[in-house]
Amino acid sequence: MASQDRGSDRTSRRLTKKRKDGKKPMRDVSLDMPERFKDGDDAHEDVTAPKGNHTMSMNQSIFSMIARAGQQSNTDLGTMQEVDSGDSDDEGTRNVPYHILDGAARLSRLSTANDFQKTSGQTRDGKTEKGKHRRALSENKLLRSLPKLKIASRKDARSDGQGADQMSSSQFLPPRPSPEGSMPAPASSPPPPAAKGRVRPGDGIQMEKGRNVARKTRQRSPAAAATGEAPVSLAKRIQHIFEFAQEEEVISEYPCWLLQSILLQGYMYITQKHICFYAYIPKKHHDVSKTGYLSKRGRSKHNRYWFILRGDVLAYYTNPAELYFPRNRINLQYAISAEVLEPKRKGDEETSFVVTTDERTYQFKADSVASAREWVKSIQKVIFRTHNEGNSVKISLPIQNVLEIEESSILDFAETAKVRVIDNDETFAIDEYFFSFFTKGQDALNVLRIMINDNEHHQAAQKPVEPPSRALGQSDSGFMASTNAPSEVPHITENVRATLSPLTAPHVGRSSMSDISVRSSVDANRKNRDVRRSMDAGRTLRRWSLEGRRLSHEAHRSPSPSGHDKTHKGRVGDRSPKSPRATDSDSATFSLDPGTESSAAIQSMDDSTASASQILDRSDLFRAPVVSSPNAFSNGVNMSAHSQDTTRSSAPRPAYSKGTHPTTSPSIDPLSPGAPDGEYDTDAGGATRLSGSSSALQDIASYPLQKASGLAGFLRTRSKKMGNLLAAESMGYYEKVSGMLAGGRKHYNTAEGLETDDQVNVYEDDEDAAKATDNFREHFAFREDEVLQSSFFASLQRVLPNYGKIYISGRYFCFRSLMPTSKTKIILPMKDIENVNKEKGFRLGYYGLAIVIRGHEELFFEFGKAEYRDECAITVLRILENTKYLEDDQSSSSGVDSNDEAAKAEHDLLQQAREDNNVDKTKNLSEIVRAAADDRIPLIFDDPLASFVDFKPPEPLTIVCLTIGSRGDVQPYIALCKELLKEGHKPRIATHAEFEPWVRKHGIDFAPVDGNPAELMRICVEHGMFTYNFMKEANSKFRGWLDDVCSSSWRACQGADVLIESPSTMAGIHIAEALEIPYFRAFTMPWTRTRAYPHAFSVLEKKMGGGYNSITYITFDTIFWTAISGQINKWRRRELGLQNTSQSKMQASLRPFLYNFSPHVVPPPLDWPDWVRVTGYWFLDEADTYEPPADLVAFMDKARKDGKKLVYVGFGSIVIDDPAALTKTVVDSVLKADVRCVLSKGWSDRLETKDASKPEIPLPSEIFQIQSAPHDWLFKQMDAAVHHGGSGTTGASLRAGIPTIIKPFFGDQYFFAQRVEDMGVGVWLKKVNTSVFSRALWEVTNSQRMIVKARVLGQKIRKDNGTQVAIQTIYRELDRARSLVKKHAKLDGELSEEFEEDWTMVEDGEEIDVPHPFEVQQPVAGISQDASKMGGGSLVLGSMVLKGAQKRSPESAYRG
């Protein structure tokens, strides 16, 4: 149908090629074209075609010959499947299957690699209410090492969600009535657990994580209660946020920066007993932080990809236009560091950088040093956010723990205080914190020193101490320091509490994971405390210390040292049987198996008890065993076991103390420290996991299996499925391979909205569901709140079927190829899917399913059975029913984490308390350097001279923008210059004199450039832009015109510091060389060589492939330079005083280039270098000052009242042969399409040929003619736009989000017409006649698919800020532009020292004889001739070639 875009038509034809009935499949988006829009007699006419000589435009002349030899385009999605021999992304190369590790086990491996001493735990209250999605408590990657709390099984939880979302209608199942009062819940929400384990109120403040928890907390908190009442004091607010036992007077507060791998802006609060730091950093999981091209190191070479850093995922793509097809995704949640590599040679600057995760290291290469640093900084920000607990940074340093305050000179531009503090009362590890002050630094240092020196607790701590002999319940006064501690340390009655790890003191050896050592505990009676209690208000459970491999339990988060730590009683049904510890606890080795589902899984084993599977899989067993004393576990220490697996059976299972037989102990403390705290999964290679469905198996698993552990390592129970014991390794492999080959589907939870009778499938048990969900997240680098709902085996149909697996979650439709040579992945957001349609398969016996995607061609999948295809369609449609009406700004893609609500409220309350206390609000440097995008971590600590404040030059610059052409060529520069004025620079626009009033109206300096744009437009329309006929006429008639343009441009650019030129001006690059200033290019159409798009002046109606596209740039540049080189070189010698130049010497391809169109309209090609930047449109908004005529407003109101669509028609100031015929065609088409038209009749007769006796065509009441109106105001009122396709006009109509019809006339208009049609947001009008034009008008005003695509594209373009991106690019690339400035040799001066320059630069009239070969070789052999004379021989050869070339005419050069 005409209503479908070209890509959709192509796919539809493929899908229906083998249909026997010959009919096209039904599409909800298809249009029934009315009969009146059939082609009429004028269907082949074109009223805009030139009369008389039918000249061929460039895209029909020489490039037609090139096209015949060009390679056919291969831009199909199949290009994503090529085997990359140089890529190192093969998941099979990993040493340990990463997907089998739970969150804390991954963190354990992370700590092993980096010694990131992050010991504070975190938890999430996963309770879901009213269908809102919340991460389940057990799914948190940092909780699985914690004591177990009972969590309701997913089956029980699922019962609450059934029937909540009734699918009202479906093409597969009959509708069912919705229960009264039931509201549909979003499909992305997992089933709410029936009864979540809840921590006692005294165990911590439930505040930070989880929106529902935050709401309840604020409702019962004093802060929330005081929102509408009297202001709460700052001291009270700090007590609440930092969880002090009592309110403490705030001595002072200072804005400061925490210095770690980054500079983090926040506030320091000094109270009576604490030094506190607070900073708010929302985790933005959906914001795109940075995009660009990088080269990724593979096995044998570097491969260039398009990278997108979104949230905490770094994804890279082979094709930037196919963002649904990532090459791979790197999850930065488990990243450790990012850093630029050291240069191999001193003095060089390295453009490579590495990103280290807990399992591998990725190496990337940027195009420039600045780009590499920016990528590293952006990734470091993400790593910092993911390593910090919660959405705010909180640090509480007890003053009695502080050893000293020192002034540091680590930063040159700020005063920095180094605080050395004892971390905890067990290891007495010393940490260092650096706080930088841009203002009041000395005041802060003085106050800190006074507080430390005069504090009574600190003074008391300076007295000699004795070895500790404190009992468990001993009071503070009797608490002594450890014997392992320094000889003189303060009383440690409270630990440092922080949500992130500090900088470790260089002279203090912190225990490392790589050592697998247990931190010694010298006091057998002292309770095992958390090393650092997190103050993240939502995390009430604390994970055990990873660095020490010791157990810790959840304690009251109050710093009171005398209170007993409260334990949590185990909930029934949460623990599975585990392999008990060895009887000899003195030789117990605490090992963290990578196959365990709980990272806190502890197994005691020696060499005799290690199973074969464990020996094969565990590298830690080859290390020296760590012996732990039994005293390390005090009798007073209780351990509560918290399972991360929510799918365990609810059958009660006791936990046993070490050395106790399971059948002889009548009363076992479930919190005994001897109880193992994890379960082993043989899928990962070695431990045993037993299902709880059989009491006999429970007894077997509970009995000590020291002598049978080798056999137990290979066995597991699958009683629910098979009832027999099978070999885990071999069976797991067999199940995977046989399941993949057999195909099928699996569902992991009950489909919401379906009654029991509607369930057409068998659901997997909860154990397999959890494992499948973990694998799903691992494959696609999703966050832990993404829950897998269903999976299907199917083939992605392309040129050849690509067999793989479909994964469906609440928010994504994903596909992963299972073919050995393919790495194809698809990540398709559900919100981008319009519909799913059942189709016939391409192959006999297969059943097809077409996924209709918004703004993209359909994806076609083939299933082995019809029922599998139908179930997949049902699953997708059910999710679409719940998500189709969600707006982007209301969904989770708004950029701010939904869990940030509580932290944001906490931050706002603290800000209010600070204002209420009349804090000094003087603006300081820390606020000035805040990032433009409201980034809460604006700066990365780096070279302060190179990276401070976005590379902005210290002095204002005179920036000249040089361009020629029409109004559309000048308008973008006005928008750019207005922003440059705001930056403090002095911009100037050099263009035609007729635009001077318009430019000066905006306060911009102006310089005139000669040349009549109307004459230029005439030959462009008549001959085509830069065709051979165009060049011929321009060469014969416009030699004087070109001389005038060059000379006037030279005068207009005097005094410039930076030159920005449109390449069509032809003179700017030479002027910049003469002035020795940085030179930038900027244009509205592709001008840089690429295989992705043809040259904007060489667009054909049919795509010809990358070979044709690339050669169009070479051919155009060659023809263009050949035509003007003689005249340009004469002008260079005459006025600029420069020698002759050539294409290679100009180095145009190395110059920084700014493209002022949107990357959503023209995605940056893969082969463009980093200094070529697509910035976005430079819009000049004038709607605020425009007052529309009353009759125009009345016309539009009447059209809306009549229910008619409004269409804008205007072709600018195009000159055509017969304007009356065009006007008549527009009138007839508008009437035939039954729309209302706002007409801007700018077209006119060709110059000096207007016939005054020719009457104007009368306009009917359905058409309202205007002279002019700002596009940014007018297009918002329209339903569609028809215009000539200029870059600025196209950008304005697309930004308004309306379908666009383009009738191109010359130049880049053909390029943008093709882009609009390719994107499916408009129509490329090849001819203008009533039949074609009226049909196009009806289509753009009635095709819902096109309307929706245009609206979505408009939303994306409106989010761009092209002028700001352009300015930042200018700042960033200024050094590169300066590096390309060369000292030129004047004609009357000595030859340049540059060897390359000496070869070709000679005078025209200079006659030099060619020497014989021996005359050159002899001095070389004897090294007796001067080097300059040696170059003379080469100089003569070069002069002869150049001299011969100059004698040829441009036409003969072209013919040759």
From Swiss-Prot:
Low complexity: compositionally biased ranges: 510-523
Listed Basic residues bias regions: 13-22
InterPro entries: ATG26_PH_GRAM1, ATG26_PH_GRAM2, EryCIII-like_C, Glycosyltransferase_28, GlycoTrans_28_N, GRAM, PH-like_dom_sf, PH_domain
Key word Secreted present: no
MF terms in GO: sterol 3-beta-glucosyltransferase activity
Keywords: Autophagy, Cytoplasm, Glycosyltransferase, Lipid biosynthesis, Lipid metabolism, Membrane, Protein transport, Repeat, Steroid biosynthesis, Steroid metabolism, Sterol biosynthesis, Sterol metabolism, Transferase, Transport
Record's bilayer topology term: Peripheral membrane protein
Enzyme kind, highest EC tier: transferase
Feature: compositional bias, Polar residues: 54-63, 109-123, 585-612, 631-650
Main location: cytoplasm
Swiss-Prot/TrEMBL GO biological process terms: autophagy; carbohydrate metabolic process; lipid glycosylation; protein transport; sterol biosynthetic process
Known EC number: 2.4.1.-, 2.4.1.173
UniProt: UDP-alpha-D-glucose binding residues: S966, R967, D969, A1269, H1271, H1284, S1287, G1288, T1289, D1308, Q1309
Region (Disordered): 1-229, 500-612, 631-691
Residues covered by the PH domain: 287-384
Catalytic activity, reaction form: a sterol + UDP-alpha-D-glucose = a sterol 3-beta-D-glucoside + UDP + H(+); ergosterol + UDP-alpha-D-glucose = ergosteryl 3-beta-D-glucoside + UDP + H(+)
Keyword Metal-binding: no
A GO CC term assigned to this protein in UniProt: phagophore assembly site membrane
Similarity annotation: Belongs to the glycosyltransferase 28 family.
Comment, domains: The GRAM and PH domains are required for the localization of ATG26 to the preautophagosomal structure (PAS) and are involved in autophagy.
Summary of the function given for this chain in its UniProt record: Sterol glycosyltransferase responsible for the glycosylation of ergosterol to form ergosterol-glucoside.
Record protein name field: Sterol 3-beta-glucosyltransferase
Organism field: Leptosphaeria maculans (Blackleg fungus)
Primary gene name: ATG26
